[in-house]
């Protein structure tokens, strides 16, 4: 059967009103608010809590670092989630921040990534269970992780073998955004060379960082994503303290070499990271989590459930797990193929 030609565009003779649909969607979405879940992964003492507080210009989580120079670094002992409701110009954001144990801190770091990957998959599993209930909620509470901030130690050399393994495991299940922590410990030349070596390692090990390529992007979106890819990993500095520069209070740090202005692009790339996370790609991370990472997980789970049901008592004559789950499995498998998994 021949494909039908695309319909011609028609302009109504008078105003109909369906152009207000975007305003209708906006009103409903503003009333409901938005959910954003971020997980921070990295060794202890790299400023994970401080960066989150700097991004959102609010004290949201307590630092696990040292209060005094001679105090040993305090380690996060278990995966912890903290939730906040933030409002800006009438837009409400329900923010869930997940802090993780400082992986790589022990002598034996074998499979230290397992608890983190398990936590991310557990959120997918909880969402799937609610999605497949007979009387599904209209709005399912979403704890799926939308962004993983991965903190790289500013060694100036290269990624450690454990970094490569963990990045590979995480990039399979979540949107990973790598950052070079405390980049003010590097000179401008050292920072540039370090970034280039890390990019080369990403390419060599085929590590897929967010944002991803997508054939559906237009030229403007592709250009923006390329700019982001050129910056990854972001060399950042975080600070919750205000310092005075030229009579103006700014977020920054004072050290023996001088003053670091967190929002000065000549000093670090924090402003690019914040704009990327909050102003240009926030919705993209939420959609990618749902359409790629969660769909991949769901398709595998439903297929496993169906195969388990088929091999249960009675063998192949057993009934499918449920008509609804059967349909979901088919949909998930199709999307899995479309997304290249």
Give the location of each predicted region.
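Conserved G1/Walker A P-loop phosphate-binding module
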Residues: 1-123, 264, 274-278, 338-340
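Alpha-helical scaffold elements adjacent to nucleotide-binding pockets in ATP/GTP-utilizing enzyme cores
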Residues: 51-55, 112-115, 119, 166-169, ...
């Amino acid at each position: 059967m021949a494909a039908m030609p695309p319909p011609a565009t028609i302009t109504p003779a008078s105003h109909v009103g369906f152009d207000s649909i975007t305003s209708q969607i906006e009103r409903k979405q503003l009333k409901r608010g938005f959910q954003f879940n971020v997980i921070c992964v990295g060794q202890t003492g790299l400023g994970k809590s401080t960066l989150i507080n700097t991004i959102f210009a609010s004290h949201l989580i307590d630092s696990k670092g040292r209060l005094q120079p001679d105090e040993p670094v305090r380690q996060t002992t278990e995966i912890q989630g903290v939730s906040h409701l933030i409002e800006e110009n009438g837009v409400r954001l329900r923010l869930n921040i997940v802090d993780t144990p400082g992986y790589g801190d022990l002598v034996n770091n074998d499979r230290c990534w397992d608890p983190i990957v398990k936590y991310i998959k557990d959120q997918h599993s909880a969402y799937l269970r609610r999605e497949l209930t007979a009387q599904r909620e209209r709005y399912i509470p979403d704890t799926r992780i939308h962004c993983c901030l991965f903190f790289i130690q500013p060694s100036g050399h290269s990624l450690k073998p454990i970094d490569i393994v963990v990045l590979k495991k995480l990039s399979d299940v979540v949107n990973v955004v790598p950052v070079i922590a405390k980049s003010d410990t590097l000179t401008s030349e050292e920072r540039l060379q370090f970034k280039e070596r890390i990019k080369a390692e990403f390419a060599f090990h085929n590590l897929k960082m967010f944002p991803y390529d997508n054939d559906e992007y237009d030229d403007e979106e592709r250009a923006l994503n390329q700019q982001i890819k050129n910056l990854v990993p972001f060399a950042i500095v975080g600070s919750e303290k205000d310092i005075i520069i030229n009579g103006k209070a700014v977020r920054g740090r004072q050290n023996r070499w001088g003053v670091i202005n967190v929002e000065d692009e000549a000093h670090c790339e924090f402003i690019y990271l914040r704009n990327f996370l909050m102003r240009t790609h926030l919705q993209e991370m939420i959609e990618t989590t749902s359409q790629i990472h969660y769909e991949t997980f769901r398709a595998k789970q439903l297929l496993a459930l169906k195969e388990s049901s088929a091999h249960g008592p009675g063998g192949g004559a057993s009934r499918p797990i449920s008509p609804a789950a059967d349909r979901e499995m088919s949909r998930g498998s199709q999307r899995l193929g479309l997304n290249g998994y």
